């Protein structure tokens, strides 16, 4: 799934530009992705793109501190929680977006969840939501896509 998401991110500046799902599926098949990965990635993107931010908006009100539940602490490594905090502290994630990212991270198979996957997932959530991202923070997240810094 993550390879398909990475490919789509690199090929499209706007997820709304995908057009017809069946045509996109054929294009992805032609590039070499299998149907299961394509379906999983497109379903995931649809769910993120269609997700209403409304359930999360309460997090934007006030200046409270995010306390992780025990189950979240067990699931999300200190590195992943640190990444989320760093991105929020530096304006890349609003509290509502943070909650959406946490929900998406908790949906992953624990074996798939590492810091690079978390960076990629944050980038995909922000991309699907068409959110603005500070350039230097975007650069840090893009390292997860390219495996190396893209700016020198």
Curated annotation (Swiss-Prot):
<comment type="similarity">
    <text>Belongs to the Smg family.</text>
</comment>
<dbReference type="Pfam" id="PF04361">
    <property type="entry name" value="DUF494"/>
</dbReference>
<protein>
    <recommendedName>
        <fullName>Protein Smg homolog</fullName>
    </recommendedName>
</protein>
<dbReference type="InterPro" id="IPR007456">
    <property type="entry name" value="Smg"/>
</dbReference>
């Amino acid at each position: 799934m993550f390879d398909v998401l990475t490919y789509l991110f690199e090929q499209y500046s706007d997820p709304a530009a995908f057009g017809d799902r069946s045509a996109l599926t054929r294009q992805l098949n032609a590039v070499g992705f299998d149907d299961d990965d394509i379906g999983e990635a497109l379903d995931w993107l649809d769910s993120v793109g269609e997700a209403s931010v409304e359930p999360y908006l309460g997090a934007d009100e006030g200046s409270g501190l995010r306390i992780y539940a025990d189950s979240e602490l067990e699931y999300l490594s200190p590195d992943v929680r640190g990444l989320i905090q760093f991105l929020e502290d530096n304006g890349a994630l609003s509290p509502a977006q943070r909650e959406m990212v946490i929900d998406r991270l908790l949906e992953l198979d624990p074996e798939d969840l590492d810091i690079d996957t978390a960076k990629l997932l944050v980038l995909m959530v922000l991309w699907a939501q068409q959110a603005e991202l500070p350039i230097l923070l975007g650069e840090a997240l893009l390292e997860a896509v390219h495996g190396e810094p893209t700016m020198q």
